[in-house]
Amino acid sequence: MGLSMDRSPYSRTGDRDRGCWYYLRYFFLFVSLIQFLIILGLVLFMIYGNVHATTESSLRATEIRADNLYSQVVGLSAAQANLSKQLNISTLVKDTVMQQLLTTRREVERINASFRQCQGDLITYINYNRFIAAIILSEKQCQEQLKEGNKTCEALLFKLGEKVKTLEMEVVKEKAVCSKDKDSLLAGKRQAEMQQEACGKAREQQKQDQQVTEEQLRKVQSLCLPLDQEKFQADVLNVWRDSLVYRSLDNIGYHYSLMPEFSSLRRTCESLPGIMTTKVEELARGLRAGIERVTRENGELRRQKLELERAIQGEREARTRAGTEAQARETQLRTECARQTQLALEEKAALRTQRDDLERQLEARKRELEQLRTEVDVRISALDTCVKAKSLPAIQPRLPGPPPNPPPIDPASLEEFKKRILESQRPPLVNPAVPPSG
C-alpha cells in the first residue's frame, strides 16, 4: 500500500511537499527494525546465554520487558488507531486535493489556452496596428488630397468663371460684329436691289434703243444694200442726158461755140454725174461707218449689259454667301458657347461629386478608425486581464519582437481587413418571431 501510494502522482508533485504516507513509511520501517533487533537479541541470548542461571532473572526481565512491550503495543495500537483515523482523514484530504489539483490543472490549461489565444490576438492586433497606422496615413493623405482637391476645384471654378465671362464677352463682341455685318449686308442688299432696279430700267431702255436702232439699221441696210454704183451712175447719166441742162448745153453749143469757157463748163456738167456718184458713195461709206459704229456700240452695250448682269449675279451670290457665313458663324459661336458652358457645368458637377465622394470616404475612414481604436482598446484590456489572471507558472511563448523594418502593407489584405471590419459592424439580421403552433 505504501509502494502504491509512493507511485501515485501526488508523491511526485514536488520534493518539498511531504504527505502523511511519507512519514508513516519511515515510522513502520523503524518499528520493524526494532522488532527485528529484539528477536535477534532473544535468539542470540537463547543460543549463547546461561539459561538455567538466569532464568528467573531473565523471566523477570522478560516480564518487565513484556509489560513494557505490552504498554508499547497498547501505545502503538492507540497510535495506530490515531494514525488510521489520520490516514482516513488524509485520504479524504488527498482526494479533495486531487480534485482541486485536477480542477487547477484544467484551469491552468484553460488559462494557457486563453493566454495562447491572447498571444495570438496580441500578434493579430499588432498587425491590426499596422493596418490602423496605414489607415491613419491614408486618412491624412485623403485629407491632404481633399484640401488639394478643394484648392484645385476652387481654382478650376475660378478659371471656369473667368472663361465663361470671357466667352460671354466674346459672344457679345461677335453678336455686335454680326449685327454690324448684318446691317452692312442689308445696306449692300438694298443698294444692290437699287442697282438691280436701275440696271433693269437701263436694260429695258437699252432694249428699246436696241430695237429702234435695229429697225433703223434694217431700214438703212434695206436702203443701202441695193445701192449699185454703176447702176446709180448710169441712172444719173441717163437723168443727166434727159435733163434740160444737157439739152440746153447742146443747143448753146451751136450759138456759143466760140466762147472759151464753154468747153470747161461742158466738161464740168458732164462730170457732174461722176461727182454725184462720188458724193453718194462717200455718203454711203459714212452711213456704213455709222452703222458699224452703232453696231460696235450695241456690242459694247451688250458686253456691258452681260458684265453688269454677271456683277449683279456675283453680288447676289456674295450677299447670299455672306449671309450664310454670318448665320453659320453665329450658329457656331452659339454652339461653341453652349458647349463651353455645358463643359464648365459638367466639370463643376464632376468636381463637386469628387469632393463629396472624398468627404464620404474620409468620414468612412474616420468611423473605421474610431471603431478599430475602440476594438483595440477592448482587446488590449482583455489581454491585460488574461495576463493578470494567469497565476500559475507556465511556459510562456516568446513574443516576437517588432521587426526593425515592417513589411509593406498589402493592398488586398488592407481591403480585406476593411471589409471584415465593415461586416462586423453591420447590424445582425433579426429573424421575425415565429408564432407558436397550436
From Swiss-Prot:
Pfam family, one: PV-1
Positions of the UniProt region annotated as Disordered: 393-438
Keyword Glycoprotein appears in the UniProt entry: yes
Annotated GO biological process: developmental process; MAPK cascade; positive regulation of cellular extravasation; regulation of vascular permeability; tumor necrosis factor-mediated signaling pathway
Topology, Cytoplasmic side: 1-26
Lineage: superkingdom: Eukaryota
Keywords: Cell membrane, Coiled coil, Cytoplasm, Glycoprotein, Membrane, Signal-anchor, Transmembrane, Transmembrane helix
Subunit structure comment from the entry: Homodimer.
Identification of the protein by name: Plasmalemma vesicle-associated protein
Recorded name of the encoding gene: Plvap
